[in-house]
Amino acid sequence: MSIMSDNWIKKMAESENMISPFVDKQVRTHNNQHILSYGLSSYGYDARVSNEFKIFTNTKPSIIDPKKFDQDCLITKISDICIIPPNSFALGTTIEYFKMPRDVIAICIGKSTYARCGIIINVTPLEPECEGHITLEFSNTTPLPAKIYAGEGACQFLFLKGDQPCNTSYLDRYGRYTKQIGVTLPTV
């Protein structure tokens, strides 16, 4: 397996629509203001978070059960800023739509700027032939409220190419989160 370079990522985004919309450089400022960077990097792609968030709340006592997820434990917020309560959690989604090739898997890592503020971002791997907007999990590990900026970089995807295509892809297995649009809640 090899990690893929900016040249390969750009070629795949432009010829195969692997990432859409695609930004072919690192963007670090907007209107002369510093932002959390996004776009193509040397060996990855920094994706942006959209303005749709689902924030966990305790207004209705509930137990988080991945097999019977109760949406009442969430509040939906459409905003350029998401405030995550202390020691809490929020879901977001990428602006970019991903369409993975059959011989490639992508691993997501968080932005160091967020990590240094106690904000951890988790995403499971984008498996071969996975397609859709990617739901991002933001965890505020601090005892203080934390701010997430919509439209700015949230995480980086690293693309690993196998030496041959897989036998069974995410699409072949009818992956439950395929072709997701927006924040997608857990389902079993």
Swiss-Prot record:
Instruction: Tell me one GO molecular function of this protein.
Output: dCTP deaminase activity
Q: What InterPro entries does the annotation carry?
A: dCTP_deaminase, dUTPase-like_sf, dUTPase_trimeric
**Could you name the domain of life of the organism this protein comes from?**
Bacteria
Q: Which residues bind dCTP?
A: 111-116, 135-137, 156, 170, 179-180
Q: Name one GO biological process term.
A: dUTP biosynthetic process
Question: In the UniProt record, does the keyword Nucleotide-binding occur?
Answer: yes
Q: Which Gene3D superfamilies match?
A: 2.70.40.10
Q: Which residues cross the membrane?
A: none
EC number, UniProt record:
3.5.4.13
Q: Does the keyword Cell cycle apply?
A: no
Q: Which CDD domains match?
A: trimeric_dUTPase (cd07557)
Q: Which PANTHER family match?
A: DCTP DEAMINASE
Enumerate the NCBIfam families for this protein: dCTP_deam
Q: How does it assemble?
A: Homotrimer.
Family (UniProt): Belongs to the dCTP deaminase family.
- The protein's name: dCTP deaminase
As recorded in Swiss-Prot or TrEMBL, the protein's gene is named dcd
